[in-house]
Amino acid sequence: MDASTPLPPASSSPRCNPAPQTIHIEFPHHSSSLLESLNRHRLEGKFCDVSLLVQGRELRAHKAVLAAASPYFHDKLLLGDAPRLTLPNVIEADAFEGLLQLIYSGSLHLPLDALPAHLLVASGLQMWQVVDRCSEILRELETSGGISAGGRASSLTLISTTSSGGWCIRSSPFQNPVRSSASTENSVLPESPAGGEGSELEGMLQIQVKVEEEEEQGSAAPLFQTPQPERVSGGVSQACGSHPLPTPALPSKPSEDESSTVDPPAPPVQASQILYVNQENVECKEEIARGTKEKTKVLSGEDSEEKEELRYLLSSGGGESSGAGDPSWKPVDLHGNEILSGDGGPGGTGQAMHGPVKLGGTPPADGKCFACLCGKRFAVKPKRDRHIMLTFSLRPFGCGICNKRFKLKHHLTEHMKTHARALHACPHCGRRFRVQAFFLRHRDLCKGQGWPTYHWTYK
């Protein structure tokens, strides 16, 4: 056998090749050590690829870390990968630097009065875990009385937990222990003093977390809150300054002084059956331009059944118009024309008044919901409008050539055929148009080409 000839591969048997064994290696503190190294690089200015300008202060960071921690930075860097980012002026530099430290280290130590600023910045950066945790801290402090205790809870520390995947609160060594969040759900907010630094700070904190608390109060309101009239109770505390404290959603028991001053509820009064008649007006824009006020007609149910007459009341409370004198306003039809009745009507003395009427209450059984002031009712609105126009000889459709007016649109269409020979004719091709705008458009496009009887061609 030649030495250059390759040897055939040896046949492998299942007995010679055992199944491969896998080894699982885990480092529990790898993420924390990695964050610590990244934070050290940030502080030393190593491998930083973005500069953040906040109120004239420049901070260096890593794009990958910012994009992973904040959806705001993720979208901003995705749209424009710029080496320098300028944040809005509403973001405080100290609060942003604290949140940047929280992103890299997973913990944050801050004074209590700086918590609203950090909450505002976290909301702007869309760091919702931090927003939720800060809101929970504020609720726990309010429940435990840590805010109104004269500044005893002066500092807080936010740390991250790998087990829960969020943020948790750790009290300072000189801070009173706070109650768990589970106990705050069934507890009632205590009253705080009306003056002092504690109440002012509480008002500031309540304003900053107003958006977050509204969502939770909306979900908890159907469980605890009962429908009550809006009133300011004497037992609810008010913060000093121009920022009032929001009242708690939980119902509170009124005090003895309050119960003595509050009037007892009035007995229920049976509402009278009144049908509201609202006049419809097509040309409402012209009415508003003229400065006219909206008129409201009220149709009493009892009078309509017994006497079948209408009483017109002014919406401003001017009183009821008498039948002998002229009313202070004139009823109008769909097109803004004055409705004439009595001696001035086109039909002579005693002619019924016409106008669109909107019936309130339950719809009639026959389905005729569109009524006229004369008493007739129609199933569809066009028939009611046609009835009013024909009764008053309204002619809203006018001819633009001879200034004749017609009651219905198809009458105007038939009338336009009489002007077929006198309409606009193209001097180049001889084509005639009824509308001047169409004629002008055609004249600009026509180049003298003839128009055959079987085909029209546009250029």
Swiss-Prot record:
A Pfam family annotated for this UniProt entry: BTB
Residues in C2H2-type zinc fingers: 397-419, 424-446
Cellular compartment(s): Nucleus
Gene Ontology MF, one: identical protein binding
Keyword Cell membrane set for record: no
Domain of life according to the entry: Eukaryota
Residue span, BTB domain: 48-112
Cross-link named Glycyl lysine isopeptide (Lys-Gly) (interchain with G-Cter in SUMO2), sites: 285, 293, 368
PROSITE patterns membership: BTB, ZINC_FINGER_C2H2_1, ZINC_FINGER_C2H2_2
InterPro entries recorded: BTB/POZ_dom, SKP1/BTB/POZ_sf, Znf_C2H2_sf, Znf_C2H2_type, ZnFinger_BTB_dom_contain
Gene Ontology cellular-component annotations: nucleus
Keywords from the UniProt entry: DNA-binding, Isopeptide bond, Metal-binding, Nucleus, Repeat, Transcription, Transcription regulation, Ubl conjugation, Zinc, Zinc-finger
Start and end residues of each stretch annotated as Disordered: 178-200, 212-274, 293-356
Statement: the UniProt record of this protein carries the keyword Cytoplasm: no
Biased composition, class Polar residues, residue ranges: 178-189
Function field: May be involved in transcriptional regulation.
PANTHER family referenced in this protein's UniProt entry, alphabetically: AGAP004733-PA, ZINC FINGER AND BTB DOMAIN-CONTAINING PROTEIN 9
Protein name: Zinc finger and BTB domain-containing protein 9
